[in-house]
Amino acid sequence: MYGRDADEAPGCVHALFQQRVDGDEALLRLAGLRFAQIGAGAEVYADTPDQLEHVLRFVPSHPSLPVVHLNRGVNVLHGRDRALVQEFADRFAGRIAGLVVHDKREMGAQTDRLVAGMHELNARLCQRPAGPMVFLEYAAGLDRGWFVEVAEQLRDAERVSFCIDVGHIGLRQVSARFADRHPGLDLKELGPADHRLPDLVADIQDAVAAALPHVLDVTRSLGRLGKHVHFHLHDGHPLVPGLRDHFGFLTRLPIPFSYQGRRSLSMMYGPGGLASIVSTAIDACPSGGASFTIEVHQVEGRLPLSDAAWLFAHWQDTANAERMNYWLSVLSENAMLTANSIPPMPLR
């Protein structure tokens, strides 16, 4: 369960806990070792209760229970999917802190139905006191005002709250800001090597800088409701081909020319933006609390296994283990950045 005593830290940092590459259970044992070393909570992906049961075996103990990100196809507009959420909540009561589900484009035109369904789900969740929260994540690119409005209508649903995905909110605002200046030109059509980029880069970076204020505004709006708010933290840039977010906060985007003295562009947030998001969340959610998950997917590299080599003594080729180890090291770096952005508790 979420909520904290006065002596507890004001925000919990989680990171993705999953098997990112092909291999056996040694990869999950590696994740368990690294999570225990960095002291981060876990957020795991699970499509079925049995799948979650399996992964939880490898998650090390932590003061904050794991958060579970359900399949992105789950649509809480539908009774059968709310029943699935309830099944997870019942089976893992007392073992997980929260369940994350995505919003959907169609919800924008069915707000009343969504709110009614979430009130119904909340009533069922409240029947089991040790059960998890359910967080509706901003993911479909709907107007942020709609998202806040839904949250306000569910203010009294004590077991239902919201997840702010800073990448999704930021990219929507970046695209809108750029479109205002360049109607008819879609940012998705551009890339780092586009010949038009030198003439457009200043406006693109101006739009990129507009992401942070909007994330902070949504954070303050939800914080005023007095509920626990969960955050998915990752960086991104509209010029990245394919998936434009889910990068770490120390990443820059390489370009083939110099802009402001560098042959790379700053992403939407960077370490400074991350610090602003975290500190604003802590300030905005004093009563309900806030939690954070480092949701970084896009990592390429290998790192020697070092102290974890014994886990893979039965492997002939440890390339995938080293890839997993490198990804975990990036999660660790970003988890430390996030934890260092949380203001210390005042001395008493």
List the model feature ranges, each with a label:
Residues 1-46:
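Boundary/entry segment of secreted carbohydrate-active catalytic domains
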Residues 1-12, 32, 60, 81-97, ...:
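Histidine-acidic metal/acid-base catalytic patches
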Residues 14-23, 45-49, 69-75, 104-106, ...:
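Active-site beta-loop-alpha junctions enriched in small/polar residues
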Residues 36, 57-64, 123-127, 149-159:
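Short, surface-exposed basic-aromatic patches at helix termini and helix-loop junctions that form
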Residues 36-113:
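Structural motif corresponding to the early beta-alpha repeats
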Residues 66, 134, 162-165:
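Residue-level marker for buried hydrophobic side chains located in beta-strands
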Residues 110-139:
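Catalytic cores of phosphodiester-bond-cleaving enzymes
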Residues 131-155:
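Basic- and aromatic-lined ligand-binding clefts that recognize polyanionic substrates
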